[in-house]
Amino acid sequence: YVDDGSGDATPHCLAEALARYPRLRVLVHPERYGQSAALLTGFRAARGEWVATLDGDGQNDPADIPRLLAARDGAARADLQLISGFRKNRQDSRLKRIAARIANGVRSTLLADATPDTGCGLKLIARAACLELPAFDHMHRFLPALVQRNGGATICVEVNHRPRTRGFSNYGVADRLWIGIVDLAGVLWLKRRALRPEARELQRP
């Protein structure tokens, strides 16, 4: 679990959980660095070959993780590196759903990542692919395109989405728009200039 500088009761709850669950590991940021930084911290600390991610607001359903694993195991692709959740029935406000639909459409068209819902926090990603990702703020919104940029395959799986019962979102529609435009241009630049050279070593006769 990555605590991104929480100012509420999260540290206390995590301390109690540590005492109760021996396998739990908690990584704490001294201040808020953002969702992308939290993901990078988790990726680097992970010990398994695959990493499952989900947001801490309770809207992602952990019970969907086996569904992602099943999709990975059932895919006939050796280059598969990312399984993304797709919140077909989002439990958000109408304004947020409309904004997300437009943003996803523009992003998917420009980046050609074939991902209808890149903002879903529920994902399963190969740790090796995680460690090759470029590190920049808001990169979590473009994981499918970034994985594809490095030569990995991605697929989407429909997942559950639950209503928010507490707290509030740190993402507004207006700030997402302008930041998203800048980030999209940057990712498009990265994707078009990706280098994946291949070579074979000559053997001595």
Sequence positions of predicted segments:
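Hydrophobic targeting segments
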Residues: Y1-V2, I181
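A ligand-binding cleft/hinge motif common to bilobed small-molecule-binding domains
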Residues: R149
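Negatively charged linear elements and acidic catalytic determinants
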Residues: L190
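Short linear elements at protein peripheries
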Residues: L124, E132, C156, A194-P205
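Glycine-centered tight turns that cap/initiate beta-strands
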Residues: R20-R23, A153
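Acceptor/aglycone-binding surface of glycosyltransferases and processive sugar-polymer synthases
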Residues: E16, R23-A45, W50-T53, P62-R141, ...
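Conserved alpha/beta core of the MobA/IspD/sugar-nucleotide pyrophosphorylase nucleotidyltransferase superfamily
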Residues: G152-V159, V173
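A conserved acidic beta->alpha catalytic loop
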Residues: D3-H12, G58
